[in-house]
Every structure is written in structure tokens, then in C-alpha cells.
Design a protein with these regions (language model features):
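Bacterial N-terminal signal peptides that target proteins for export
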Residues: 1-10
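C-terminal motif of bacterial Sec signal peptides marking the signal peptidase cleavage site
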Residues: 18-21
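Conserved active-site regions of diverse hydrolases
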Residues: 23-458
């Protein structure tokens, strides 16, 4: 997912008002462990391999870069596995010279809410550091990584893509293309084959796949189809059979309910009205927006609190300037105000689409849990943890309260979907809990306070 380098200043003002500089100086850096002597239980962690998508790769802040890779949950887990006999963990890191990787976004100052002009420089796009060329579609291809790899996370990959020939070609997924040899014969390698080729000697695995089969539907307002459950099941069964060959143990993580993330919960009708006021002070508050909706008999209706406006609506700098105009959209009526000229579906996940998404995610997780149980694997339900994060009181650990709030909640990064280092540490602890419960191990947890949240950077 790519993000514009500027936010509408009115939105950022409303989001960052009250943002305080935080430190962890008052937190015990040794907190978060059980105190039990580390032991491996019935599992063997001597060679760990991680399979998954962007969350596994360490994607954050709208990009993949060296620091985000170093704070990936597999790297955090591998560090804890060393206390129970785990070995070195090799990731496909961008070099220090190309540390910016694919590029990312960062917060460079706390804006002065009394001076909106300062907000124009509050968000900065960091230029990519590892682009070697562009493909025929004009998309960036990254500097190749060669050699041993134990973090097989590929941003953007779906369960539906596991057996797709050409997925790692220059016209395919650039994050996967980066991992394959720079020879023509490698272009037909599927992700399933790549995983198979990197399992030699592996004694333990984690597998977090399936997120993008739901996420791409959600972030496009239902435009991109959901993966069919039958295909999801077929491909996942093949992957599980491969990963558990020879009795290999591991942990499976379920598909999160993405609609609790800031990407879907930050923009409300009240927020939109505040921004419109900044753009046009004479405009009265809108009681609702006119939206395209899958559950509307005529294709459009007034928005309700159960419809979710996407962060992309604000990240598109020109979108809000269209509100009320009659020369954009269908050009029949006022844009986003009259039902004859509704806000396009790609900017809203309507209530009907939310219900469809939730049903499919539940189906996906049933498939994952059934496979984990059948194979005797540890299973993590991420939604138990995320529900705590999204609750009114958030999740308190070691003196810090974490929430799902955008920028200030501590869990989600600048892109509103992927995690901060602290968020990845929290997830790592949930995975460790599940592993310990399943295999009788006593792997120590990490202290999330030792990992940073959204930072102000120069």
C-alpha cells in the first residue's frame, strides 16, 4: 500500500492536537518476563523459519526498510528462541547503504495547531534507497537479495498467490522478485516452491498468511474481491502439509479483523466536517454523506455510523476539495452530498461490506484453526489481543497503555495498518504465550517498552 507524503492539514491538526512527547525512562526495561528458567519444552528451535506477508517481513510506515525489518516479529521471536537453544536468524535485510529500502513515511514534527501552515511539513516521505530499476509498468524493482534467508515474509502476498507462476517475475510482486535469483529460470518460481527451497534443516516455523486476502478488499472499499474460501483452503492445506513434513512443529497466526485499525477508525463524519470547515468556513455541518453502497437498492444512500470511511480519502489531497461541487463525480448534483453524486465506493467500507468481510474472515480463521489443530500446531487468535487494544481502556503493560488510536496509540505505525516496533513486540508476546502453552516451553517474553512507538524524526 502506498501513501501520499502530505496529509490534509485540517485532519492532522485534529489528530495530533494534544500529542505529547513520550519516553520510556520510567519503565523497567527488564519487565515482561515470567522469571522461569527458559526451556524449550517439546519443540526444537535450533533453526527457525518464518512464512508470511508484510507483517512477517516487518513492513511499517507504508514501506519496508532496514529498521522495520530489524523490528519484525520473527526477528524478535528469534532473539527469544536463543534462550532455549535457537540459532542465528538471517533476514533479507536491505544494506546499511540502502537502509531506506522501499521508502516510507515519517512524522518530522508536532504541528502547531494554531498555525496550520506548519502541518505541511509535519509528514515527510522518505525516498526509497534500494531501487535498482523499474519494470515495464513503471513499478520499482528493488536491489536483489541473495543467500540464506529465514524470514520469507513477502509484503502483499495472498493465500491465493501461493501457487501462482510468475508471481516473482519483474511484472509480479517486487518484494518477492527481490528474493529470487537474477536469472530467467527463477521467474516462474512460485512462493510455495520458494518456501520449500528454504526449509532445509528447519526445525520450527511460524506461518502468518491470509491477511491480504481480506485486507485488499477492505482497503479498496470492497472493490478488490475477497479470496474464495475454497481456494484459500486448498492453498493453505498444501502449505501446511509442506511445513509439517517430518513432524516439524510450529505456530499459526490467524487473520486479524482489519477494521479495528486506524485506517478504518480515524475518519468520522465529525472529522470530515471539521476539515471541510477549514477548507470552506461557511459550509454548514453535513448530517451525513451520500455514499455508493453495496447494500443500497439504488446503489447510493446516506452514510450511517456503521459505515467506515477510509484513511485514503484524506490522504488523497484533492478529494475533500471536491465536496459539494457539481463538476466532478457524476456531475449530477453536489459531490458526496446528493445521492445522485455519491462518494465513490473506494473511499468507504459500507456496513454491508463490513458484514461480508467479517463473515469471510471468520471462514478463513476456521480453516486456519482446523489445520493447526489437525497438525498439532500452536495457534494464535490475533483478534483476542486486538480486541483489547481497540477497547475503551486499551491494553496496559509495564506502565504503558496501548490503544488502536492513530499515531498516539503506540501499536499502529504511520500507515494506519501495520505495526510499530512496540506493536510487533506485543504480537511477539502473544505468539510466545501460545508456543509455551502448546509445547510446554518457557520462552521469556520481551518488554514492549523497550521498543519504540511512532517517533518524531528529523
Amino acid at each position: 500500500m502506498h501513501f501520499n507524503n502530505r496529509f490534509r492539514w485540517g485532519l492532522v491538526a485534529s489528530l495530533l492536537a494534544g500529542l505529547l512527547a513520550c519516553t520510556n525512562n520510567d519503565i523497567d526495561p527488564n519487565a515482561g518476563t515470567s522469571g522461569a528458567t527458559p526451556s524449550k519444552g517439546s519443540a526444537d528451535f535450533s533453526r527457525y523459519v518464518a512464512i508470511g506477508n508484510s507483517l512477517t517481513a516487518g513492513y511499517a510506515d507504508g514501506g519496508l526498510y532496514r529498521e522495520s525489518q530489524l523490528n519484525s516479529y520473527p526477528n524478535i521471536l528469534a532473539g527469544q528462541f536463543k534462550t532455549v537453544g535457537g540459532g542465528d536468524f538471517i533476514q533479507p535485510l536491505f544494506s546499511e547503504a540502502q537502509a531506506n529500502g522501499s521508502g516510507y513515511i515519517k512524522l518530522v514534527q508536532v504541528p502547531d495547531t494554531a498555525n496550520p501552515a506548519t502541518l505541511l511539513s509535519a509528514i515527510k516521505q522518505v525516498a526509497p534507497g534500494a531501487i535498482r530499476e523499474t519494470n515495464s509498468q513503471g513499478n520499482a524493482l528493488f536491489t536483489k537479495f541473495s543467500g540464506t534467508n529465514q524470514n520469507l515474509g513477502v509484503p502483499g502476498i495472498k493465500m491465493a498467490d501461493l501457487l501462482t507462476i510468475g508471481y516473482g517475475s519483474p511484472a509480479g510482486n517486487p518484494y518477492f522478485e527481490r528474493l529470487l535469483p537474477d536469472v530467467d529460470s527463477a521467474r516462474s518460481t512460485t512462493y510455495f516452491q520458494y518456501v520449500s527451497n528454504n526449509l532445509a534443516g528447519a526445525t520450527f516455523f511460524s506461518c502468518w498468511l491470509g491477511n491480504n486476502d481480506a485486507l485488499s478488499y477492505a482497503t479498496t472499499g470492497g472493490v478488490t474481491p475477497l479470496t474464495a474460501s475454497a481456494l484459500f483452503s486448498t492453498n493453505y492445506t498444501a502449505m501446511m502439509n509442506k511445513l509439517t513434513e517430518g513432524g516439524r512443529k510450529g505456530v499459526v497466526i490467524g487473520v486479524p479483523n482489519v477494521t479495528i485499525t486506524p485506517y478504518f477508525r480515524t475518519i468520522t463524519l465529525s472529522t470530515i466536517n471539521r476539515v471541510i470547515k477549514l477548507l470552506s468556513p461557511a459550509t454548514p455541518d453535513l448530517p451525513a454523506l451520500a455514499i455508493q453502497a453495496s447494500d443500497a437498492p439504488q446503489g447510493a444512500r446516506a452514510s450511517t455510523p456503521t459505515d467506515l470511511f477510509l484513511l485514503s480519502m484524506i490522504l488523497n489531497q484533492t478529494e475533500l476539495t471536491k465536496f459539494g461541487r457539481t463538476d466532478v463525480g457524476t456531475k449530477v448534483g453536489r459531490y458526496a452530498i446528493d445521492l445522485t453524486n455519491p462518494l465513490p465506493t473506494q473511499y468507504v467500507l459500507d456496513a454491508g461490506e463490513v458484514a461480508t468481510l467479517n463473515t469471510r474472515v471468520a471462514e478463513f480463521n476456521t480453516i486456519l484453526k482446523t489445520q493447526a489443530d489437525a497438525k498439532g500446531l500452536a495457534y494464535v487468535d490475533p483478534n483476542t489481543f486486538l480486541s483489547q487494544i481497540a477497547s475503551a481502556n486499551g491494553l496496559s503493560q509495564n506502565g504503558i497503555t496501548y490503544s488502536s488510536a492513530f499515531l498516539v496509540g503506540g501499536v499502529f505505525s504511520m500507515d494506519g495498518i501495520h505495526l510499530t516496533p512496540a506493536g510487533y513486540a506485543l504480537v511477539s508476546n502473544e505468539i510466545i504465550k501460545s508456543i509455551n502453552a502448546k509445547y510446554g516451553s518457557t520462552i521469556p517474553q520481551v518488554n514492549p517498552a523497550s521498543y519504540h512507538r511512532v517517533l518524531l524524526q528529523q
